[in-house]
Regions:
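A structural signal for short secondary-structure junctions
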Residues: 243-244, 259-262, 269-270, 294-298, ...
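Short, glycine-/Ser/Thr-/acidic-enriched flexible segments
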Residues: 39, 104-106, 150, 212, ...
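Dual-mode signal for accessory low-complexity, basic/Gly-rich regions
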Residues: 275-346
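Extended hydrophobic packing segments that form well-structured cores
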Residues: 354-399
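Glycine-rich, charged/polar anion/phosphate-binding loops
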Residues: 130, 192-193, 201-203, 234-237, ...
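A short, compositionally biased
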Residues: 198-203, 262-264, 371-378
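Active-site bordering "gate/hinge" segments
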Residues: 1-247, 388-391, 397-399
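Long, well-ordered mid-to-C-terminal structural blocks that present hydrophobic/aromatic surfaces
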Residues: 242-295
Length: 399
């Protein structure tokens, strides 16, 4: 497991991420929520102390254990399934930051649960996420998250707990003298690539690999973002496209654990922006029901690319945070079905109303599910002026 020294460095990196991810500055008496799984309690304690010393008011929330979560979906009636505790909305309307410490004790405890029930609960809480999304657009809220090693994660990744811990430490630079300085370097290197991408007037992207032939429309008033402090680690650059122009075939060769279910080899075919054919070698019924959660669940909310020169992650980690940042031999691309990111809007985010989002093709959903492809691939940008530029090939941006 991570040492006390590594945990202290991890906390410093998370606080850097929290500050970097928010456009406005934190001030004394701001409210920051620390949400954590039970195995992450020590890191929560360290963060709690550091936030108090900063003059911040920490609000600590422990996630349900696997037994609690299973009981919730097994036993809850329709009203219990959509219940929101008193005070939750008030907290979300006043919160200034959130740090999530992901340390799952089980990845499969919800297998066998009706995916429709999981979706119903997610849809019922979506209004809370809408509140903090708006606060983020206004510059008064920021968030970050990380993952800690657990026996369950290591087992499903096919690693020992020591090997798994070492992978996390390496990916997050926790063995370096100053991990924060390392992240600042990555942040600056990524800024150069984002400037290059955003300097082109891109109309659409063509993604080609052995099993992918997909066209994605960039959309008006968009910008590439990423490596912004939100996720630790994060090496991806991404955009929320205009979902309406998506067409073609996509394949996720990276397995995925979601809501206690295991999914493998997902194949999606898009027509007129929506996934019309859905297949999976494992977990197909679950995938189908997740993508039927609401009207936006079968549409794209994100398109992402990871440069293998940035990421040290070269093994399957059984966790989306790491797997969506896979470097390996050919980097990765992923799409997310479901909700989009309004911070990829190139205009003033404070003026981004629900109506403007809809008109620009920003997808809206209670779902956000990253589906990762690690095949050798080429991504070609089709420019508004008619030209074409290969922007990504063999795992790296062609800058």
């Amino acid at each position: 497991m991570l040492t006390e020294k590594q945990l202290d460095k991890y906390a410093d990196v998370l606080l850097w991420g929290l500050k970097t991810a928010r456009t406005g500055k934190y001030k004394k008496n701001d409210i920051v929520q620390i949400r954590f799984n039970l195995p992450a309690v020590r890191l929560a304690e360290i963060l709690n102390e550091k936030l108090l010393k900063m003059g911040i008011n920490p609000v600590l929330r422990m996630n349900s254990t696997p037994v609690m979560e299973r009981s919730f979906y097994d036993i809850s009636d329709r009203r219990q399934l959509v219940f929101t505790p008193p005070g939750e909305e008030e907290l979300y309307k006043n919160i200034n930051g959130s740090i999530f410490l992901h340390a799952p004790e089980s990845l499969t405890h919800l297998s066998g649960i009706d995916p429709g029930k999981i979706g119903k609960a997610a849809v019922a809480r979506k209004y809370l996420r809408d509140i903090i999304d708006k606060r983020e657009e206004e510059g008064v809220f920021g968030w970050t998250l990380c993952m800690l090693p657990t026996e369950e994660l290591a087992k499903h990744a096919g690693l020992s707990i020591k090997e798994y811990t070492n992978e996390i430490a390496a990916a997050c630079f926790l063995n370096k003298k100053s991990p924060v300085e390392e992240w600042k370097r990555v942040y600056n290197d990524a800024a150069r690539i984002k400037k290059w991408l955003n300097g082109m007037n891109i109309k659409s992207f063509l993604i080609e690999s052995e099993n992918i032939d997909l066209e994605i429309t960039s959309g008006a008033q968009r910008k590439w973002i990423g490596i912004s402090g939100h996720n630790i680690p994060s090496f991806e650059l991404f955009i929320s496209p205009d979902w309406r122009g998506t067409k073609g075939k996509y394949f996720a060769d990276q397995p995925s654990y979601r809501s206690g279910n295991y999914v493998e080899n997902v194949r999606l075919e898009f027509k007129k922006g929506s996934a019309v054919n859905i297949e999976a070698e494992t977990g197909e019924e679950f995938v189908r029901k997740q993508l039927a959660m609401d009207r936006g669940a079968n549409k794209i909310g994100e398109f992402s690319l990871t440069d293998r020169r940035f990421s040290k992650i070269n093994r399957f980690m059984a966790n989306t945070l790491f797997d969506e940042n896979y470097g390996g031999s050919f980097g990765n691309c992923h799409i997310a079905v479901g909700s989009s990111y309004s911070d990829t809007f190139s205009g003033d985010p404070k003026k981004l109303t629900r109506e403007i989002k809809k008109n620009l093709g920003f997808n809206d959903s209670a779902l956000h599910w990253d589906l990762v492809n690690t095949e050798k691939k080429r991504v070609t940008a089709r420019l508004a002026g008619g030209g074409k530029v290969v922007i990504y090939e063999n795992g790296k941006f062609m800058i």
